[in-house]
Amino acid sequence: MAMQAHYEAEATEEEHFGPQAISRLEQCGINANDVKKLEEAGFHTVEAVAYAPKKELLNIKGISEAKAEKILAEAAKLVPMGFTTATEFHQRRSEIIQISTGSKELDKLLQGGVETGSITEMFGEFRTGKTQLCHTLAVTCQLPIDRGGGEGKAMYIDTEGTFRPERLLAVAERYGLSGSDVLDNVAYARAFNTDHQTQLLYQASAMMAESRYALLIVDSATALYRTDYSGRGELSARQMHLARFLRMLLRLADEFGVAVVITNQVVAQVDGAAMFAADPKKPIGGNIIAHASTTRLYLRKGRGETRICKIYDSPCLPEAEAMFAINADGVGDAKD
């Protein structure tokens, strides 16, 4: 009896900390058919429903205004969404996991590594190490927490066809991990257009509700937007679509506590101001991507295989630089 009570207590504790399955709403008096409709529309957790605007629920066929209000009211009871003290928030922040980048210098710059529960954007020219960092993180996120990992699987959305499993095997060997296990723990998808890229996030949400993921990579988040939308005439449509995509990424980071890493390309400034700028290149996506990313890292080439990473924007990290190297076994420290 005592044992059963112990297991029940453990189960409620688990529900409290992790995302709650959408089926929980049935226990709160929501019709099973309505819960099924929510699931089909891409809502797999109570958190996803609670964070959604009412307008989004009304777009689901068969959900009336009265139903939407009832669903949101019940979801709000299960998900704490009100004010909290800064002390409590500070306590929650201390539980955030940092995933190692593979380079001690880079980890020191990021005060531990890539943060879970937020979006980290890496931008730079070609050959600056963006994709290599993504490959290394896809392996390190599987390590135990005491070794700088996130003890979870990785999800990789590739828009440019640059994903190479061989690189993961080389990094796995360096950390003494089984190559086949590492590859099994990486869910890979190739995105072919911007709508497909967004659609993949609905699938990602369903997979994250089923299994423990620590990292979601989108390499690159903006490449397809440059080809699917062209010219100034389509700029506002492009930015709206991009904003929606980034909002979904942020929601996944909030809902499942995963680290979201996106890469971005740069564009050369060709206006008059570029003559006076120290570096005439800037990340594409404008203010929309600048506001969505929590931490922005600017990567540039150094000598030989070395690369330099600069904190371009962060709410808590000071502006500084670190040097790292791209080795045969992934990202590591630069040799002096």
UniProtKB/Swiss-Prot annotation:
This protein's record includes keyword Transit peptide: no
Single GO molecular function: single-stranded DNA helicase activity
Domain of life (superkingdom): Eukaryota
SMART domains: AAA
One annotated Gene Ontology cellular component of this protein: nucleus
Swiss-Prot/TrEMBL GO biological process terms: chromosome organization involved in meiotic cell cycle; DNA damage response; DNA recombinase assembly; DNA strand invasion; double-strand break repair via homologous recombination; mitotic recombination; mitotic recombination-dependent replication fork processing; reciprocal meiotic recombination
Positions contributing to ATP binding: G124, E125, F126, R127, T128, G129, K130, T131
Sequence motif Nuclear export signal, residues: 242-257
Domain HhH: 45-74
Subcellular compartments: Nucleus; Cytoplasm; Chromosome
Keywords: ATP-binding, Chromosome, Cytoplasm, DNA-binding, Nucleotide-binding, Nucleus
The family this protein is said to belong to: Belongs to the RecA family. RAD51 subfamily.
NCBIfam families referenced in this protein's UniProt entry, alphabetically: PRK04301.1, recomb_RAD51
Subunit structure: Forms linear homooligomers, giving rise to a RAD51 nucleoprotein filament, which is essential for strand-pairing reactions during DNA recombination.
Function per UniProt: Plays an important role in homologous strand exchange, a key step in DNA repair through homologous recombination (HR). Binds to single-stranded DNA in an ATP-dependent manner to form nucleoprotein filaments which are essential for the homology search and strand exchange. Catalyzes the recognition of homology and strand exchange between homologous DNA partners to form a joint molecule between a processed DNA break and the repair template. Recruited to resolve stalled replication forks during replication stress. Also involved in interstrand cross-link repair.
Name of the protein in question: DNA repair protein RAD51 homolog A
Organism: Xenopus laevis
Lineage: Eukaryota, Metazoa, Chordata, Craniata, Vertebrata
